[in-house]
A protein has these predicted regions:
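Structural beta-alpha unit
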Residues: 1-11, 16, 129-164, 170-171, ...
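Short beta-strand elements of ligand-binding domains
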Residues: 10-13, 38-44, 193-196
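Glycine-rich, Arg-bearing micro-motifs that act as flexible, cationic patches
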Residues: 11-30, 161-187
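Short acidic active-site motifs
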Residues: 27, 124, 146-151, 180
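Short, structured interface segments
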Residues: 28-47
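General small-molecule cofactor/ligand-binding pocket signal
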Residues: 40, 89-91, 137-142, 193
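Small/aliphatic-rich secondary-structure junction motif
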Residues: 52-108, 131, 187-188, 192, ...
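A short acidic, glycine-rich active-site loop
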Residues: 109-120
């Protein structure tokens, strides 16, 4: 893969007969974490005509690499939408008010704080969507953990594909780090396209040098 410079790796996934959910193997996780090319994990499910494709973004990130990855996620998702005659939607999760802050600071107003965070995420996501001529109706900005929000929105929309960014060993773009990345993907019951940021160098490539 690294030596030949392929543009895409497609890997089949297995469905657990009892749980009726997709089971990702250690090989799947290895590819997601270390493969420099986009990885498409597919299940045995046909894509419907005029379906939905969901792009998972973090519109409030201030990291330039993450912001660039957001745009790549949307561009690649839109390209697939054009091929599949599907509708593109964005999903952005924002955190709930930390309980410990409300307890430790008596004058803290959790309601006001939560509204401020929500407003920031809505405005940032809508602005990102506008760059790609997407309407606000195509944006889903919801409170909660990414591993809860993204699969929930994907299920409600009956999305055939979720496009998501990964940044190697640190997990998914921006807020999606560590085990959170695996929880998100593990909770999705649809195809997943995992993208790396531009300039990503696989640790496997370093070993080959």
């Amino acid at each position: 893969m690294i030596n030949d410079g392929y543009d895409l790796v497609v890997k089949g996934t297995h469905q657990h007969d009892t749980l009726k959910s997709v089971i990702f193997t250690p090989t799947d996780w290895h590819l997601i974490r270390k493969c420099p090319a986009p990885v498409l994990l597919v299940k045995e499910k046909e894509w419907p005509a005029h379906g939905n494709i969901l792009a998972a973004v973090n519109a409030v990130s201030e990291n330039e690499q993450h912001l660039a990855l957001n745009k790549r996620i949307i561009n690649d998702a839109r390209f697939i939408c054009d091929l599949a005659n599907a509708q593109l939607n964005l999903v952005n999760a924002y955190p709930a008010t930390p309980v410990n802050i409300a307890i430790e600071i008596p004058e803290f107003n959790p309601g006001l704080y939560n509204e401020s965070v929500k407003k920031h995420h809505i405005e940032s996501t809508n602005a990102l969507a506008a760059e790609f001529n997407l309407s606000q109706e195509q944006c889903f900005i919801e409170e909660g953990l990414p591993e809860d929000v993204i699969p929930d929105v994907a299920k409600r929309l009956n999305s055939e594909l979720v496009v998501i960014g990964t940044v190697g060993r640190t997990g998914l773009s921006a807020a999606l780090v560590g085990n959170t990345a695996e929880h998100v993907i593990d909770s999705l019951d649809c195809d997943v396209l995992a993208l790396k940021p531009d300039g990503y160098v696989s640790p496997m490539a370093k070993k080959l040098d």
